Design a protein with these regions (language model features):
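Substrate-binding cleft of secreted/luminal carbohydrate-active enzymes
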Residues: 218, 572-592, 600-771
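C-terminal membrane-anchoring or membrane-association module
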Residues: 829, 833-847
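Active-site-adjacent "subsite" loops/lids of carbohydrate-active enzymes
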Residues: 320-324, 332, 399-464
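Aromatic- and acidic-residue-enriched segments that line the glycan-binding/catalytic groove
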Residues: 365-375, 405-436, 474-507
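C-terminal low-complexity, Ser/Thr- and acidic/Pro-rich disordered "stalk" regions positioned immediately N-terminal
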Residues: 773-820
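Aromatic-lined substrate-binding rim segments of carbohydrate-active enzymes
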Residues: 340-341, 358-405, 517-539
Length: 847
């Protein structure tokens, strides 16, 4: 917990103001901080202390002020500054849309000034003179609100009472504070339950910042309906009441875990609760005996941290689970990749989703005539280095590819990009241009030629790199707002052929054809998902297919034309990553878990890059994911995960048990799931009388028998059925549910492996395949090898020939056209015989 440098004399004025920088004309200026000891995101102001490390590790797009242990500024300028002992660094980033914090530092902070921060109110204060820090630590915060029980609009602050209904009815784009009996009892979320003896304060936009900055658990709260003001008070009484209330929630939470037979370290948790209660009781006694407010508040902060750890530890810690990060590679050599992968492994990560295309290029070696060329700043095969390093450390390597978003027209090396070479393949907005505010060059999903080329390129990758999963990102249109995309001749033609409106669609949401125009574009994206699924099943069925999607169904379909519900219904995906960056996505994750069933794992994308979240919030969200049925988490992104120290916080709580990824070794994963099930029986169910000792022995023996049959990622059907019958016979519903949940996690793995085997049998026998293209060919006469001249080999060929023109549109044909008809007939006959044999075997097994 950071040292408090509180400014009570200023707080009365500051807390009445909107949380924006105050004009710089005064001798004292104050600004809101975005975070502490975390990744400096776009437009952020971050404070870095010694706890973060020796340096700030920031890039060149900001400026920093170094503050000594006496709170005096010793230097202003640069980035990646050393953090002084006993001092801190204030780091600002510049953004046109998110905040100009570099400019704020340059205008307001000078060598010799005094700087103080308050991590409770998230305020930074700069003064030309030192400020007396001996005053009280408490404060009041008051703000006008927009109304009682009204619809929450943009930047609104609304008070909801029980006369509104059971919940606030708000969407996911806000933040809410619940007040019960005049006391703040919960923070965060949306569509919150409204207590009969209290109210909910609901914020959107800039009002969210105000609530997050000034309101904390335990504060007293009231509102004046006639004046339309809400007031929160932080004082000794509210701190005492709040801490006592928080501590009292822990024993019931632990008791509830016991009743549901959660697999926890109950003796450890009970001891931690007792220690936290004693620490608070001692601090309270000292405060009542003329102790200082500051010392009392500081100890309460320590207790709050301990409570957060305890709460997050009241969560399952599975031994088979995705603990993944997205990574944009920046390493200059395979050796650096190895070191980085190991660092992530040691921080609790078991899967890396490495970005395959950015900076107008790709990270793998490609044929000379390919429309995708390796990023010129890399002189080695980055993808191969990540595959090798991940497998060396027992981690899955997923290739994260942006599908429709292929480049940036204003970026470096744009002339090497597929969008530059094939502008006719780009998606256009209603104005007939491919341009959008993010400068994303997006492929038109309705263009069949483009789709075929992309799928052929992905086949080339899958044939030549031992990736564990192919991940579809930007598998959608550019998000609809003032601009809408998909207005191409290819799309118009196909739309008319399907719907026969006799008009060319325009951006008119009230048009008679609008719903069909949306549906049509969703179908074009869906066709790409289907094509990739079919290609993988034919070429390397053991490769998983995943997709990164908008976290809400409505947001995906209405604004991005992304119909992932259909993809789940068709069983095309093995993993779905809802990008739940922020808070309040619990209902959406539960809905997607239900939609996915046992055929697809939900692995939630969490926004560790967001300064307002931090390690504690990542732990809470990971625990919530467990509760909601997700099969793990994927953090965006790797560097932020490491800088935010999320790893140590997670490994102390939700990730306290080491976990293997599900599909690197499916046999080992299934056995680990079954061992976890046995552990729950031995350590929880029998001791807490969920089942008898005899039942425990019988079920454990059945589990052991099933483990012996695990092979090729599957379990023996008869023994699995026998175990299910034994679980069904358990009389206690909660005990039965706990064990069935464990077995279900093992069965989810088998569902994917059955699909793999099915496609190996019925897909690969269809036609003989040509030799996989070698991305590392031996140099021909007069050519240099890739090792000697990697940069040259990645450049597009400048020769013009009919063969190369054909290659530009088809990349490489994966099928060998040189096979004789006799060979094909023989292979087809063999395929028919084998398929018949498989059907007979399956029928006999069912009998």
């Amino acid at each position: 917990m950071h040292l408090k440098r509180l400014l009570p004399a200023l707080l009365a004025v500051i807390l009445l103001a909107v949380s924006l920088p105050i004009a710089a004309s005064a001798e004292v200026v104050t600004v809101k901080i975005n975070g502490f000891d975390c990744f400096r995101n776009s437009g952020n102001l971050i404070v870095y202390t010694e706890a973060y490390g020796p340096k700030t590790n920031t890039n060149e797009w900001g400026v920093e002020a170094v503050v000594g242990p006496d709170n005096k500024v010793v230097s202003v300028g640069g980035n990646d500054n050393a953090i002084p002992a006993g001092g801190f660094v204030v780091s600002g980033h510049e953004s046109d849309t998110d905040g100009k914090m570099r400019t704020w530092i340059q205008q307001n902070v000078h060598v010799g000034d005094y700087v103080y921060y308050n991590d409770r109110t998230m305020l930074l204060t700069v003064s030309t003179e030192p400020i007396d820090m001996s005053a009280e630590v408490f404060y009041d915060a008051e703000r006008a609100f927009n109304g009682v029980n009204v619809t929450r609009g943009e930047n609104f602050l609304v008070v909801y009472t029980s006369s509104k209904g059971k919940t606030t009815g708000t969407n996911e784009f806000g933040y809410e504070v619940t007040v019960e009996d005049g006391l703040v009892v919960s923070l965060g979320g949306n569509d919150t339950a409204i207590p009969k003896n209290g109210f909910v304060v609901s914020a959107h936009g800039s009002s969210i910042d105000w609530l997050k900055t000034y309101v904390q658990l335990g504060m007293t709260a009231s509102y004046d309906a006639s004046a339309k003001t809400v007031k929160f008070s932080y004082n000794a009484e509210s701190l005492e009441r709040g801490m006592a209330a928080i501590l009292e929630t822990l024993p019931p939470a632990l008791e509830d875990a016991k009743e549901n037979f959660m697999y926890l370290q109950y003796d450890v948790l009970e001891q931690q609760i007792a220690e936290a209660k004693k620490l608070f009781a001692d601090a309270l006694a000292a405060h009542r005996n003329d102790g200082s407010d500051r010392e009392f508040a500081t100890v309460c902060d320590v207790v709050t941290d301990k409570v957060a750890v305890i709460r997050s530890s009241i969560s399952e810690s599975y031994t088979v689970q995705y603990r993944a990060v997205w990574v944009r590679p920046s390493q200059k050599s395979a050796k650096e990749v190895d070191a980085y992968v190991k660092e992530l492994h040691d921080a609790g990560i078991n899967t890396i989703c490495v970005e395959g295309n950015f900076n107008n290029g790709v990270i793998m070696n490609t044929p000379k005539d390919c429309l995708f060329q390796r990023i010129k700043t890399f002189n080695y095969d980055v993808l191969q280095a990540y595959v090798d390093a991940c497998h060396k450390y027992g981690m899955e390597c997923h290739l994260w590819m942006a599908i429709m978003e292929v480049g940036h027209s204003k970026g470096q090396y744009y002339s090497d990009n597929i969008a530059y070479k094939k502008p006719e393949w780009l998606s256009l907005n209603q104005n007939g241009t491919p341009h959008n505010p993010d400068d994303f060059m997006m492929i038109d999903p309705a263009n069949d030629e483009a789709r075929e080329y992309l799928v052929n390129f992905y086949e080339y990758i899958i044939r030549n790199y031992d990736i564990d999963c192919f991940e579809l990102d930007y598998i959608r249109y550019y998000s609809r707002s003032d601009l809408d995309f998909g207005y191409t001749e290819a799309a118009f033609k196909k739309f008319e052929e399907q719907y026969h409106y006799g008009v060319t669609p325009t951006y008119d949401t009230k048009a008679a054809y609008w719903e069909d125009w949306k549906k049509f574009r969703m179908s074009q994206v869906t066709e790409m998902v289907k094509a990739v699924r079919e290609m993988i099943d034919r070429v390397r069925p053991e490769v998983l297919l995943s997709a990164d999607v908008v976290a809400t169904v409505n947001g995906a379909t209405e604004y991005n034309y992304q119909d992932f519900v259909t993809w789940l219904e068709k069983d095309w995906l093995d993993i779905l990553h809802p990008m739940a960056y922020g808070d309040g996505y619990g209902d959406d994750i539960r809905q997607q878990v239900k939609l996915a069933g046992d055929q697809c794992m939900i692995v939630t994308g969490l926004g560790v890059f967001m300064a307002e979240l931090g390690a504690t919030e990542m732990v809470r969200q990971a625990a919530e994911d467990n509760q909601n049925g997700a099969y793990g988490d994927c953090f965006f992104e790797g560097s932020a995960y490491l800088k935010d120290m999320a790893g140590p916080a997670l490994m102390e709580t939700v990730y306290r048990n080491q976990a293997i990824s599900p599909f690197l070794d499916p046999n080992a994963s299934i056995k680990a799931c079954l061992d976890y099930m046995k552990g729950r029986i031995k350590d929880v169910l029998v001791p807490f009388e969920g089942i008898t000792a005899d039942e425990g022995e019988k079920i454990s023996a059945l589990i052991d028998g099933l483990k012996e049959t695990v092979s090729q990622g599957k379990m023996d059907g008869e023994k699995l059925k026998e175990l299910h019958m034994a679980l069904k016979a358990i009389s206690g519903k909660k005990a039965k549910a706990a064990l069935e949940s464990d077995l279900y996690r093992a069965e989810q793995i088998t569902c994917v492996t059955y699909r793999v085997d099915q496609n190996k049998l019925y897909g690969e026998l269809a036609l003989p395949k040509g030799e996989p293209f070698d991305p590392h060919p031996a140099p021909g006469p007069g050519e240099t090898s890739k090792d000697e001249d990697d940069e040259e080999s990645s450049k597009p060929s400048e020769e013009s020939s009919q063969e190369e023109s054909t290659a530009e549109s088809t990349l490489i044909d994966p099928v060998d056209d040189g096979g004789s008809s006799t060979t094909i007939i023989i292979v087809l006959c063999v395929a028919v015989v084998l398929a018949g044999a498989v059907v007979v075997i399956l029928v006999l097994r069912k009998k």
